[in-house]
A protein has these predicted regions:
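Active-site-proximal loop/helix segments of hydrolase catalytic cores
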Residues: 1-60
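Binuclear metal-ion centers of metallo-dependent hydrolases, dominated by the metallo-beta-lactamase
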Residues: 39, 46-149
Length: 149
């Protein structure tokens, strides 16, 4: 199996992967091993009942990604439900205010072929920035992108 995975990487290895189906647990470990990305983006958070991305999916992506600090980005940042809100402590009683709030992240990927930037929009501005930015640079010797901390 290892030989087949290494041969397949010559044709299918990627630097940045986009996870299929919101990070569900319906995936092939062997396929993830072949992809061997340095970063993976998971689009999730469409107010669905499946708890995507799944914990086993996140673990497997991390385990079979390359680099000491592989990157996993998910558009799902936070959710709150009515069972967690204590409205009796709020002074506002305006019934038109929305009480259940869902916030999703926005992820941008940009590259010129030698550098790549993956930026995730923050929920709140920190200092003067609205983005959490991660940089990848092309390593000529390894012929692959590397995460620059």
């Amino acid at each position: 199996m290892e030989k087949a995975i290494n041969i397949a990487r010559d044709f299918l290895q990627v630097d940045i992967a986009k996870s299929c189906h919101h990070g569900s647990s319906d995936f092939s470990t062997e396929f993830l091993r072949v992809l061997n990305p340095i970063a993976t983006v998971i689009s999730s958070g469409d107010d669905e009942p499946y708890a995507h991305p799944r914990p086993d999916t996140l673990g497997t992506i991390g385990k079979y990604s390359r680099g000491e600090r592989s990157l996993i980005f998910s558009t799902e940042l936070a959710r709150s439900g009515q069972e967690f809100l204590d409205l009796s402590k709020r002074k506002e009683t305006d019934s038109t205010l929305e009480r259940v709030v869902t916030v999703y992240g926005m992820i941008n990927v940009r590259t010129d072929g030698k550098k790549a930037i993956i930026a995730q929009k923050l929920e709140k501005v920190v200092g003067s920035t609205k983005w959490d930015i991660h940089k990848l640079e092309w390593n000529e010797q390894k012929e692959a992108f590397e995460y620059i901390m």
